[in-house]
A protein has these predicted regions:
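Motif-centric detector for short Cys/His coordination patterns
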Residues: 1-86
Length: 86
């Protein structure tokens, strides 16, 4: 499973489309807030967080400075899941 598309929603929430046809709403607020890693904490700046892209099926920020795998996004950050309506 890989990520096909990502769309910024608001705050630290994203809408993510996976190759399995599912769309999830994800929330990264707790992850970013609780991290003790300075490289991760800087994405608490919403303008930096909004720069998310898809790179080789991963969520990626700042040219790979922070990357999160599709499996981790799906299993650890999803708060709502539905099938895409094609």
């Amino acid at each position: 499973m890989k990520i096909l598309k990502v769309k910024y929603l608001h705050d630290y929430k994203l809408e993510v489309l996976f190759t399995n046809g599912k769309i999830t709403t994800t929330d990264f607020e707790m992850f970013l807030t609780n991290s003790k890693n300075k490289c991760i904490n800087k994405f608490l700046d919403k303008e930096k967080f909004k720069t998310v892209t898809v790179d080789n099926g991963f969520l990626s920020w700042n040219d790979g400075e922070m990357e999160i795998s599709a499996r981790s996004v799906y299993n650890d950050f999803s708060i709502d899941t539905q099938f895409a309506n094609y």
